[in-house]
Design a protein with these regions (language model features):
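Short Gly/Pro-enriched loop/turn and capping motifs at secondary-structure junctions
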Residues: 231, 260-262, 291-294
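Fe(II)/2-oxoglutarate oxygenase catalytic core
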Residues: 1-222, 244-245, 270-320
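Conserved short secondary-structure elements within globular domains
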Residues: 198-206, 224, 235, 258-264
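Histidine-centered metal-chelating micro-motifs
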Residues: 253, 258-274
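A short beta-strand-loop-beta hairpin characteristic of the jelly-roll/cupin
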Residues: 226-248
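Ordered, helix-dominated protein-protein interaction surfaces in large eukaryotic regulatory proteins
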Residues: 226, 238, 252-255, 265, ...
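Conserved metal-binding segment of the jelly-roll/cupin
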Residues: 224, 245-260
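Composition- and surface-driven signal marking solvent-exposed, interaction-prone regions
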Residues: 234-239, 265-268, 299-301
Length: 320
């Protein structure tokens, strides 16, 4: 493995001003790809930016077993404001720009009032595994896919284990901290014996610049890729450090998720999401540990929290 120490670094403020914008070639000086082999990349400030492992999953039965399941997922989210720009054609809902610099809108309800919930452009992106308390769901829980599609979930778990092994081999200190953190969470909310609680599945979505909110601060993110068909773009850039990765099929990237990062636009040949019909697809799978899951109780106690929440909502509607 080759070590790279970058010689340029921008300010955090300048990187944050790019949030929601998509990456362009002007944003990077160094571009990593499969031809260059494995790379460990440090910033000019001495921090570890990423470790790039091209082809690390090629020929791995766990990768081959998980792909059909993840390809077949029809997860859709409108809670990805950082994915708004460049993906508006996924669904035109009359989005408007909000002061945060992200594309958000509020729907008009049937009674004519405006919803208080902000939404973004719908994209093929979603979460599987487990999730902590948040917003309207103040209880820890399995995602719907993990709870209902148990056989398919079982086909994904070996890939999570394989990626956990690559994390331990390549970022040992961070992997140890993250594994200890996850082991302290009830078993019901861990992805088997891996150092992860959650996976985000992005299907052919070009994320605008963003930091990953909610990931364990002392941990690391792990991303892997499945490419099918012909397309251009999808280069992942860390603009503060002016380095980018053009990842290919079976590649793995270990990265600091708290750095602002984002992708260049995607342009493919043939129907999107349908490589079996001569089209194209770019699956990126991101695994991490959710920091707020340290609060999770055993499932019975979390179900009690969920029931109390349901009763509160029912009472509120009854008095409305």
């Amino acid at each position: 493995m080759t070590t790279i120490v970058l010689d340029r670094i921008g300010s955090r403020e300048a990187a944050r001003r790019l949030i929601a914008e998509q990456a362009t070639p002007e944003d990077w000086d160094v571009l990593l790809g499969p031809a260059g082999g494995q790379k460990r990349v440090y910033g000019a400030d001495g921090s570890l930016v990423c470790v790039y492992l091209p082809g690390a999953l090629l020929g791995d039965p766990a990768f081959d077993r998980a792909y059909p399941v993840l390809h077949g997922l029809k997860l859709v989210s409108d809670n990805r404001p950082q994915y708004g720009k460049g993906n508006e054609n996924e669904r035109d809902r009359g989005q408007q720009m909000w002061a945060t610099g992200t594309l958000r809108y509020r729907e008009t309800k049937l009674d004519g009032t405006v919803s208080r919930q902000n939404r973004g452009t719908e994209v093929r992106s979603g979460i599987i595994g487990y999730y902590g308390r948040s917003g309207r769901h103040p209880y820890c829980r399995e995602t719907a896919f993990t709870a209902r599609q148990t056989e398919q979930w079982a086909d994904v778990v070996p890939l999570c284990r394989a990626l956990g092994g690559l994390m331990r081999d390549n970022v040992r200190k961070r992997a140890k901290v993250q594994a200890e953190f996850v082991r302290a969470i009830p078993q019901a909310y861990r992805i088997a014996d891996s150092p992860f609680t959650t996976m985000t599945v992005n299907n052919s979505v070009a994320a605008g610049y963003h930091p990953d909110a909610g990931d364990l601060k002392a941990g690391f993110g792990v991303m892997c890729y499945a490419r099918r068909g012909s397309y251009q773009g999808g280069v992942l850039c860390f603009p503060r450090h002016r380095v980018a990765v053009d990842a290919h099929d079976g590649d793995v990237l270990l990265f600091n998720p708290h750095l602002v990062h984002g992708m260049s636009p995607l342009h493919g040949v043939g129907p999107k999401h349908r490589p079996e019909e001569g089209g194209w697809e770019r699956l990126s799978l991101v695994l991490y540990a959710r920091e707020n899951m340290a609060e999770c109780l055993e499932p019975e106690a979390e179900r009690a929290r969920a029931n109390r929440r349901a009763e509160e909502l029912a009472n509120r509607e009854a008095w409305a």
